[in-house]
Amino acid sequence: MKKIILAIFCIATSTAIHAAVKADEALALAQKVNNYFMYVSEPDPTADSHVGGKTRLSNVWMRGTYYNGLINLYEVDARQEYLDYTYKWGSYHQWRCHNDKYWDNITNADYQCCVKAYLDMYDIYGNDSMFVKAKVNFDNEVAIKRIDFWTWIDAIHMGMPAFFNMSNVTHDPIYRDMAFQYYMHTRNAEGGGLFNTDTGLWWRDKNYTDKNIKSDVKKKEGFPCYWSRGDGWVFAALCHTMNYIPDHTDAYYQQFLADYLLMAKALKACQQPGGWWTASLLAPELYPDMEVTGTGLFLFGMAWGINNGVLPADEYKPVCDKAYEALAACVHDDGFIGFIQGSGSKPSDAQPVEFDSVPDFYDFGCGCWLVGVSEYVKLLRACEISLS
C-alpha cells in the first residue's frame, strides 16, 4: 500500500519543477561533494580537523558527523573507496573515543560521536576490534549510574545512536536502556526539560529556555530561541536510533517516533520559501540566509520519514524537494559547500553565513549535507521504481 500511494503521488507531481531532479543527478552531486572532501579538503583521514585556524582531533564530533554522512552515502553508492577511507581513519585511532590516556573514561558525548561509524563498520566487516574499545568506554560510563550527562541537545546526536547499536552488537540491553534514560532526562528534566512539546522544538540547553534566556540574548538569537542545527541534531538522531530498533512496537521506538512526528510537523512550518531553514528557526529575519547544517539534517529526517512509511509523501516530499534544491545551490563548481555555519551553540555564532563562507571546521557541515542528500537519493529511487 505504501508503494502504491507513493507511486500515485509521484505520477501526480511528475511534471512539477521540484520533481524534475533524478536520483542519478542528486547522487552525482553527492559524489562531487564527497570527492572534494576526500581528495582535496582531507586527503589524509588521520589528520586533525582544520580549516579556519583551529585544529581538533579527527575522531571527535566534527569528523564523526562526516562519517555519518559518508556511510549513508555508501548505502546508495557502495564504493570500496568509502570503506577504505573510513577504515584507515578508524584503525589509526584504534577505534577509540579519544587519543589521550583517558579515552576509556570519557563521558563527553562529543568524543563518542565517532562510535556510530565504528559500529557501522563492524556491521559491515564483523571485526571485533572495531567496537571493543568503545565498549570499554561505554561500560565505564554506564557503571557510574548517572543519567544527566547530556546537558545539551547536540549530545543526543553524538551519543544515542551509538549506544543503541552497541546493544545490537553486544546483545546487551544496558546501553540502550541507559541511553533512553539519558534522553528522557534531557527531554523532561534538564533545565526544566529541553523539549517543548507545545512547539515541537528543542531548546539547545538550559540557557535558552523561555524561562532562563536573558533579555540581551533574546534580541541577538531570537525568542523563542530554537537553533536550527541543534534541532537538526535531535531530528537526525531520532531517525538514526530508530534504524537500530527493528521492533517497531518497542516502547523506546514508540517514544522516539512520537517526538519525531511532533518535530516533523513543527519543522515543516519553519521551512523558508526558498527551501532552506534559517539559523534561528522562529526568528528568520535575524539571520535570513540559507544554513546548510540544519537544512541537511532536516532533509535527512524528512526523507527518512517518507522512506520508512511514517510521514505522508504528499505532504513531505515537496518539502524534501525544495530542501534539496537549496542544498544543491550551495555547492561550488569544485564541490566545496557554502553557507555552512561554523562550530557554535546558537544562531548568532559564526555569522554571517554566506556562499563563500569558510567555516572553522568543514567536516561536520559536509556530513550534514551528505546525510541529507543521500537519504533523498533513496527517496528519489523509490519514487522512480514505483513509476517503472
Segments from the language model and where they lie:
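Long, well-ordered core segments of solenoidal/helical folds
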Residues: 26-46, 84-101, 129-149, 176-214, ...
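Oxyanion-binding "anion nests"
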Residues: 233-282
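Sec/Tat signal peptide C-region and signal peptidase I cleavage site
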Residues: 15-19
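Positively charged n-region of N-terminal signal peptides that target proteins for export
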Residues: 1-4
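The feature captures the catalytic groove of carbohydrate-active enzymes
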Residues: 133, 138-168, 196-243, 288-294, ...
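CBM-like carbohydrate-recognition segments
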Residues: 7-10, 21, 25-64, 72-109, ...
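Inter-helical turn/loop segments and adjacent helix faces that build the functional surface
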Residues: 166-174, 241-254, 307-313
